[in-house]
Amino acid sequence: MTDAVQNETVQEASAQEENKLIAERRAKLDQIRKSCKANGHPNDFRRDSLAGDLQKEFGEKSKEELEALNHVVAIAGRVMAKRGPFLVIQETSGRIQAYADKDVQKVLKDKYQGLDIGDIIGVKGALHKSGKGDLYVNMEEYELLTKALRPLPEKFHGLTDQEMRYRQRYVDLIVNEDSRNAFVVRSKVMSAIRNFMISKQFMEVETPMMHVIPGGASARPFVTHHNALDMPMYLRIAPELYLKRLVVGGFDRVFEINRNFRNEGLSPRHNPEFTMMEFYMAYADYKDLMDLTEELLSSVALEVLGSTSMPYGEHTVEFGGTYTRMSMFEAIKHYNPDHAQIQALTEEDIQNRDLMVSIAKSVHVEVEPFWTCGQLLEEIFGETAEPKLMQPTFITGYPADISPLARRSDDNPFFTDRFEFFIGGREVANGFSELNDAEDQDARFKAQVEAKESGDDEAMFYDADYITALEHGLPPTAGQGIGIDRLVMLLTNTHTIRDVILFPAMRPQA
């Protein structure tokens, strides 16, 4: 018998066993409906305690102290295990045991045909401690709140199918503590970022999720149709142009934490729907943003994890201190010491397209005919340097032709005052001094339109209203976007974006 046939046989046997258990549980529910109130789904039990809080408050007390206290609590949660007379009950803060003596067990059997793993129960009783030192609640009052009709996957050797973890996240969260913890960390990261920004006098705002003209980033948008207006609209790829309109309007410091949508591929680093924090700061430049980013990330790591050092794969990354800063050109040279063409390259050579195509092909980049010199430089960097940036690093010196919204460098107008922030071998943030020259922005938008007509699907659209806004005057401003999903990946030591998005995009099941 081949492995494939054997696996199929095991799966069929597991499915048959599961169907049998589901049928048994449905039969139990039918009996419960006949004998219990609310058609077997009561909604009048109220808990007054959480397992985690009880552990903190009473975990150090002795068995005798707890007996003297006779502290009565009401808890509720999902039955995760049955160990003799003990039930293990799980809820949002953790787990606690409940003790059912013989009389209680008899009532449970008579009234509910016995409890199953996965059932949700409410329990009232005094708090005690076992001989092993574990807290438990003596079951004096109890009520089955929800009958689980499907068994949890431990019955079938755990939730081992990675894809099923994402499709049935609700089951993953029940049985996988690491998964639950990752999303607790995510929530804390969001709160820490929001509190930090507010402490720096930034105002949180909300801008449109549907755009008439998609803009603010180089990406393919999702297209929809507004029936009442009879016009196409686009799910936003970035909030940038609306946020900068607010700076024009006089809000000098604004930020937004929300979803962006990009109609692109799925990968360990990419999901079509993702969360970004974008902020804009008048009377500042990109160097100020790098300083602020160092402060923000070290603050978030310390608040959420209690340390600025954390493991990531085989590495230990350090969010504290001053981060490395180098230009894209310098990084390419630094990480390609044995590549003769790259070592001989000068900044002036970057504008030699034939030379850049030759170098790109030599490092296995598949070159598109419409790519500019800046795009070629970025692809060479992405292929040879980016994966090696494990520690926090700001990469500067982005060419203007790949930075259509960034201010040109005063030292060399081929480049812009822009950086991207890398850690763990991936980009996490992008920031720059904003282009506030309306005429230059007009010219760059037109160049983007030409690129789109030449086959670049990710080139930007021309936004006439944004040009009008700039003509009213945008003060010197710097802005940045931080990918929340990728940041959480780092802080939770996970290596695929699906592990930090509750319900990631999935291909249809066969």
Curated annotation (Swiss-Prot):
Residues where Mg(2+) 1 binds: 420, 427
Q: Which PROSITE patterns match?
A: AA_TRNA_LIGASE_II (PS50862)
Q: Name one GO molecular function term.
A: magnesium ion binding
This protein's record includes keyword Signal? no
Query: For binding Mg(2+) 2, which residues are annotated in this chain's numbering?
Result: 427
Q: Provide the catalytic activity annotation.
A: tRNA(Lys) + L-lysine + ATP = L-lysyl-tRNA(Lys) + AMP + diphosphate
Name the needed cofactors. Answer: Mg(2+)
Q: What is a single Pfam family found in this protein's UniProt entry?
A: tRNA_anti-codon
Tree of life domain: Bacteria
Predominant place of localization? cytoplasm
Q: Where in the cell is it found?
A: Cytoplasm
Asked if the Swiss-Prot or TrEMBL record annotates the protein with the keyword Flavoprotein, the reply is no
**Complex and partners:** Homodimer.
What is the official name of this protein in its record? Lysine--tRNA ligase
Which organism does this sequence originate in?
Vibrio vulnificus (strain CMCP6)
Question: Per UniProt, what is the name of the gene that codes for the protein in this document?
Answer: lysS
